[in-house]
Structure formats: C-alpha cells, structure tokens
C-alpha cells in the first residue's frame, strides 16, 4: 500500500451511521467565524449519495424561509462532527432530484415503517 491509501484507511475509521436517499438527517458541522469555532446544525433530506471510497459524498436538501438549500458534504470530512438519522424515508429512487421542482406537501416523503415479526 502506498502512503495515500494508508492515510485514507486511517480517515475512513470515523464512525458514520448508515443512511440512504430519502432519509432525514441532522449534521453537526464545525463553522469558523473569525477566531471563534462553533457547531451549526444542518437538517434536511438526503437527495443523493455518491459512494467512491474515501471520496464518498452526499447531498442534503432543506427548505428555509421558502428557499431551497442544497449542500454537498464529503462523507469523511473533518468539519462534520456528527450525523444523526432522524427518520427513514420510503423512496424508490436513489437520486431524488425531482424534489427540486416540488413545493409543500408534494415534496414530502413517506416514512419507512419497519414491520415487527413476532
């Protein structure tokens, strides 16, 4: 293994919960303002996941004050403090770009309800 692969392997050890497209997640992100550092929450729906090993990333969309905001996060970025899965969505596609054109109730995603076996 070369040095780059060793470095990537060390970075991948960061624990990240399992989530998929359609899930609502909360991301705690480090923000630097001047000399101060603080954590800011970004809550939204995962609309795309790009799996490329160490270079994996995911796109999260939220609507704030009627304006849609999309942000792409590298999965193993040091600015991500924590990822919390709030709810699992029931979707049939892996890329949910069609949500960009929808407003209000039509942009909602059904919640995935797991069946209990007895």
UniProtKB/Swiss-Prot annotation:
One of its GO terms (cellular component) is cytosolic large ribosomal subunit. Disulfide bonds: none annotated. GO terms for molecular function: structural constituent of ribosome. PROSITE patterns: RIBOSOMAL_L19. It comes from the Bacteria. The keyword Ribonucleoprotein applies. The keyword NADP does not apply. GO terms for biological process: translation. It holds the Pfam family Ribosomal_L19. Keywords: Ribonucleoprotein, Ribosomal protein. Belongs to the bacterial ribosomal protein bL19 family. This protein is located at the 30S-50S ribosomal subunit interface and may play a role in the structure and function of the aminoacyl-tRNA binding site. HAMAP family: Ribosomal_bL19. This is Large ribosomal subunit protein bL19. It comes from Buchnera aphidicola subsp. Baizongia pistaciae (strain Bp).
């Amino acid at each position: 293994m070369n040095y780059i692969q060793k470095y990537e392997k060390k970075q991948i050890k960061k624990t990240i919960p399992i989530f998929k497209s359609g899930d609502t997640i909360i991301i705690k992100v480090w923000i630097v303002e001047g000399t101060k550092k603080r954590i800011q929450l970004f809550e939204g729906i995962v609309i795309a996941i790009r799996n490329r090993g160490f270079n994996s990333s995911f796109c999260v969309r939220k609507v704030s004050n009627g304006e849609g905001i999309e942000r792409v996060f590298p999965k193993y970025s040091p600015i991500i403090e924590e990822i919390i899965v709030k709810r699992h969505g029931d979707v049939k596609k892996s890329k949910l770009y069609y949500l960009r054109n929808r407003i209000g109730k039509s942009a909602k995603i059904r919640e995935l309800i797991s069946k209990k076996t007895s």
